[in-house]
C-alpha cells in the first residue's frame, strides 16, 4: 500500500493508513507468526503442512532468528500471536459487517465472514494452553 518513486527509494504516497500504528515490535512478530497457528485449508494457514519439506521455518526458528537480529533475549511469542489473531478476527468481522450492511469494499467480503470461526478457534486453542 505504498507507492515508491521509480527513480529512487523514496516513498511518494502511503495509500492505507487505517492499520498504521506504532506499537510494540513484538506485535509485528506475532502477526508474522500467526499463520503457523491456523489450520491448512483456512485463510493462510500453515498448521498441518510439513514446514521442513516446504523449507518454511518453524515458529521457534523464526523467533530465534528475530531475537538474534534484534539482539534481544529469546521469548515466548504466544501473547503477541494471540493479540494478532484477535486483531485479525476484529478486522474480518468488520469487513463481513460491511458486506451485510451493503457497504463492502471488497468483492470477496461475503467469504471473509467464513474466516472468523477458524481464527477464533485457533485463538481459543492457544489461550487454553496458557
Model-predicted segments: where are they?
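Active-site acidic catalytic loop and adjacent metal/ATP-binding pocket
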Residues: 1-27, 31-33
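Short amphipathic alpha-helical segments and their helix-coil junctions
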Residues: 11-14, 58-73, 118, 123
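Conserved NTP-binding catalytic cores of kinases and kinase-like/nucleotidyltransferase enzymes
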Residues: 3-12, 71-74, 109, 128-130
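Regulatory N- and C-terminal appendages and interdomain linkers associated
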Residues: 94, 98-130
Amino acid at each position: 500500500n505504498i507507492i515508491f518513486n521509480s527513480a529512487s527509494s523514496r516513498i511518494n504516497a502511503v495509500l492505507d493508513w487505517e492499520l498504521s500504528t506504532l506499537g510494540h515490535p513484538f506485535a509485528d512478530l506475532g502477526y508474522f507468526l500467526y499463520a503457523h497457528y491456523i489450520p491448512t485449508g483456512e485463510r493462510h494457514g500453515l498448521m498441518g503442512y510439513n514446514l521442513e519439506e516446504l523449507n518454511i521455518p518453524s515458529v521457534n526458528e523464526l523467533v530465534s532468528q528475530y531475537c538474534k537480529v534484534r539482539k534481544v533475549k529469546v521469548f515466548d511469542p504466544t501473547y503477541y500471536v494471540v493479540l494478532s489473531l484477535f486483531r485479525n478476527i476484529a478486522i474480518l468481522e468488520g469487513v463481513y459487517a460491511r458486506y451485510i450492511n451493503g457497504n463492502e469494499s471488497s468483492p470477496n467480503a461475503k467469504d471473509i465472514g467464513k474466516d472468523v470461526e477458524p481464527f477464533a478457534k485457533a485463538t481459543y486453542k492457544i489461550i487454553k494452553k496458557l
